[in-house]
Curated annotation (Swiss-Prot):
This is UDP-N-acetylenolpyruvoylglucosamine reductase. The keyword Nucleotidyltransferase does not apply. One of its GO terms (biological process) is regulation of cell shape. InterPro entries: FAD-bd_PCMH, FAD-bd_PCMH-like_sf, FAD-bd_PCMH_sub1, FAD-bd_PCMH_sub2, MurB, MurB_C, MurB_C_sf, Oxid_FAD_bind_N. Its cofactor is FAD. It is found in: Cytoplasm. Cell wall formation. Keywords: Cell cycle, Cell division, Cell shape, Cell wall biogenesis/degradation, Cytoplasm, FAD, Flavoprotein, NADP, Oxidoreductase, Peptidoglycan synthesis. It comes from the Bacteria.
Length: 298
């Protein structure tokens, strides 16, 4: 794998890179090989090479709804953060995989285009948002997604239309097929900029009031169980404020687990398991994680 640097001298590649620098929890071990392509073509080159040489491949976006285990990740990590372009075409916006969802929503506001207001505070990348059909406050990415350009695991380029992008709550075809998102096209509607801004301000105020934005966290930890709210179940289980190591069930919103100082990924995972077990015993409800957990134990 170390041959990658010689094979691709034009692409930024780091060895044994600490992944805690790239996750919102500020936890995670090291990557064997950490690749930062600047273009779609460079991304395609790396993905194809990994496939041909049977190298394990992991795609990393903004690291916001993610826990990377303390043992890190073997093989090659491709970090798409440098694919940042956002542009307008009529009433559509085309955003590359590494563009931040927040920046894309702000771009839509600046262009007087409505439809992405719900995303104004979601801290993920476009690629990650498509992967999990991210949403908040009644809106989901799939509501406005028109098309996506993806790579297959073998490096084949595909253009997927809306009809091919079947999506459900925190699920998408992209995740199911392990596609690598390169860009996304959103169909929006013209609207008065002040109206869009007012909606964003309202949602931002709600987010700031309810979410522990002052601490590192992985966002909403659990999916919403049918007929319940995860945060309410956790609160009613007496777990709000519960601490394991440096990880704590947030005092502000029980659906979040925050890093109050020096937390490890293992702390997070132990606390998640404890919450799941307690809620299962008290309410006979299974809490399924929304946060993605990858990597190896230390």
């Amino acid at each position: 794998m170390n041959n990658l640097q010689a094979q691709f001298p034009h692409i930024a590649i780091k060895l044994n890179e600490p992944l805690s620098k790239y996750t919102y929890t500020k936890t995670g071990g090291n990557a064997d090989v950490f690749v930062m392509p600047k273009t779609i073509e460079e991304t395609k080159e790396i993905v194809t090479y990994c496939h041909q040489n049977k190298l394990p491949l992991t795609i990393l976006g903004n690291g916001s709804n993610l826990i990377i285990k303390d043992g890190g990740i073997r093989g090659v990590i491709v970090h798409l953060d440098l694919l940042q372009s956002i542009e307008r075409k009529n009433t559509q916006i085309i955003a590359m995989s590494g563009a931040k969802l927040i920046d894309t929503a702000k771009f839509a506001l600046d262009e007087s285009l409505s439809g992405l207001e719900f995303a104004c505070g979601i801290p993920g990348s476009i690629g990650g948002a498509l992967h999990m059909n991210a949403g908040a406050y009644g809106g989901e990415i799939s509501d406005v997604l028109e098309a996506a350009t993806v790579l297959t695991q073998s490096g084949e380029l595909k253009k997927l239309k809306r009809s091919e992008l079947k999506a459900a709550y925190r699920f998408s075809t992209i995740a199911e097929k392990k596609y690598i998102v390169l860009d996304a096209t959103f169909s929006l509607e013209l609207e008065d900029k002040n109206i869009i801004q007012a909606k964003m301000d309202e949602l931002t105020a709600l987010r700031e009031a309810k979410q522990p934005l002052e601490y590192p966290s992985c966002g909403s930890v659990f999916k919403r169980p049918p007929g319940h709210f995860a945060g309410k179940l956790i609160q009613d289980s007496g777990l709000q404020g519960h601490i394991i190591g440096g990880a704590q069930v947030s005092l502000k919103h029980a659906g979040f687990i925050v890093n109050i100082g020096g937390a490890t990924a293992t702390d997070y995972m132990n606390l998640i398991a404890h919450v799941q077990q307690t809620v299962r015993e008290k309410f006979d409800v299974e809490l399924e994680t929304e946060v993605k957990i990858i990597g190896e134990d230390k």
